[in-house]
Amino acid sequence: MSRMCEICGKKPMVGNNVSHAHNVNKRRFNPNLQKVRSLQENGQVKKITVCTNCIKSGKIVKP
C-alpha cells in the first residue's frame, strides 16, 4: 500500500485545518516516508518504504 510504512504500518491521519474564524476544512497528516535500501534476513538488499521514526530507531539494517 502506498503512503504506509512497511515496518510499523504508519498511515496518513485525518484532521482539520482551522482558521481564525474557526472555519474547518478536512486535511491529511502524512507520515514522513523515505525509500531506503534495506538488508533482508536472507542477505538480499531490497528497497522499502519506511517512516523516519523507524529509520532513526534502528528498526532497519542498512547494507
UniProtKB/Swiss-Prot annotation:
* SUPFAM superfamilies the record matches: L28p-like
Any single GO molecular-function term of the entry would be: structural constituent of ribosome
Record keywords, A-Z: Ribonucleoprotein, Ribosomal protein
Listed under GO cellular component are: ribonucleoprotein complex; ribosome
Tell me the Gene Ontology biological-process terms attached to this UniProt entry: translation
Q: Which family does it belong to?
A: Belongs to the bacterial ribosomal protein bL28 family.
- Quote the PANTHER family the UniProt record gives: 50S RIBOSOMAL PROTEIN L28, LARGE RIBOSOMAL SUBUNIT PROTEIN BL28A
* Entry protein name: Large ribosomal subunit protein bL28
